[in-house]
């Protein structure tokens, strides 16, 4: 068991009764607005105002948020982003052990959820340091709630790999996922992601593309992956969250399933694993699919 899981009492960040000068400080993960500043809670405003140290993903954006929230603070603001997260975590642990609370704030949403913060959380737990939060909105649950897709069971995939082959392999793994899938994507990669998803998951698989959530130009586009891929080529702008319908076990033709296997193996997945994934996702017989995929491979070799 990691040190600290069982012996740390966690209290709300605005209650100082459990902290004394001889105790370590606390890591406070501060959920910031994902767009509309009115989403900021009174607890967030108070925490930022009273903070002594704020570890910010982008110090300029943090100061802009403070200005928009009309918050004055004497906190020492330090940068804490992917490029310096490992080194800065050690420095912040020293501050925590000296008794200072450290507030972590990312550009938008909840720290450590596809954003900096996770390394500090683990390091704090290992040192027996309290980790708590000021809850705030996240694009994950906001997009899920308004997507129109099932919300009772879902999984979050963060950002898929940037490299096409790795991205396609990950989509192949998700082909059999029965839960609704939520993921993030950069606007300049959205069309490629949806093209790959349409090919691997099916052009008619339902999805929702949510952009600029809670902002003035918020938009939710719903439809099949094929039509959304076409739309994305001209309209992919802003912060993007994609929600994908889970696998329904829809049966496709054996030839279509064999083509899916061929694509997954071309992307580097072993044929046996590709066959198993496609069979579970489509409902075709695994043994029959393996034979057809093998025959198709032999035919391709003869023709080449």
Describe the residue ranges of each PLM region.
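A contiguous loop/helix-start segment that scaffolds small-molecule binding in enzyme catalytic cores
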Residues: 2-20, 24, 101, 180, ...
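Generic beta-sheet signal
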Residues: 26-30, 98-106, 154, 179-183, ...
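Conserved helicase motor
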Residues: 79-86, 160-163
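Alpha-helix capping/helix-boundary segments
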Residues: 60-62, 109-110, 139, 189
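Class I SAM-dependent methyltransferase SAM-binding "motif I" and its flanking Rossmann-like core
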Residues: 119-177
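Glycine-rich, flexible N-terminal cofactor/catalytic loop recognition
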Residues: 2-81
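Glycine/small-residue-rich loop that forms an oxyanion/phosphate-binding "nest" at active or ligand-binding sites
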Residues: 89-138, 142
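Short active-site oxyanion
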Residues: 48-54, 128-132, 180-181
């Amino acid at each position: 068991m990691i040190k600290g899981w069982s012996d740390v009492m966690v209290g709300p960040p605005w209650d100082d009764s459990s902290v004394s000068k001889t105790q370590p400080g606390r890591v406070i993960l501060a959920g910031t607005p994902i767009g509309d500043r009115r989403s900021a809670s009174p607890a967030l405003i108070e925490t930022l105002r009273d903070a002594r140290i704020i570890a910010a993903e982008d110090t300029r954006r943090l100061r802009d948020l403070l200005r928009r929230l009309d918050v004055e603070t004497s906190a020492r603001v330090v940068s804490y982003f992917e490029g310096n997260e490992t080194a800065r975590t050690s420095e912040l642990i020293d501050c925590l052990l000296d008794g200072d609370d450290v507030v972590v704030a990312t550009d938008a949403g909840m720290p450590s959820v596809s954003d900096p913060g996770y390394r500090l959380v683990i390091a704090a737990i290992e040192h027996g340091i309290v980790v708590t939060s000021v809850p705030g909105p996240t694009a994950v649950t906001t997009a899920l709630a308004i997507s129109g897709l099932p919300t009772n069971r879902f999984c979050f995939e963060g950002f898929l790999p940037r490299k096409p082959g790795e991205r396609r392999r990950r989509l192949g793994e998700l082909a059999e996922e029965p839960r609704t899938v939520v993921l993030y994507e950069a606007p300049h990669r959205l069309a490629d992601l949806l093209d790959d998803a349409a090919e691997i998951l099916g052009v008619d698989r339902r999805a929702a593309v949510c952009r600029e959530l809670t902002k003035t130009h918020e938009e939710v586009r719903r439809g099949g992956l094929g039509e959304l891929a076409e739309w994305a080529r001209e309209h992919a702008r802003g912060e993007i969250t994609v929600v994908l319908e889970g696998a329904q076990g829809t049966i496709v033709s054996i030839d279509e399933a064999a083509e899916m296997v061929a694509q997954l193996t071309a992307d580097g997945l072993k044929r046996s694993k590709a066959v198993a994934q496609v069979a579970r996702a489509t409902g075709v017989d695994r043994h029959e699919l393996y034979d057809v995929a093998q025959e198709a491979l032999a035919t391709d070799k003869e023709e080449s």
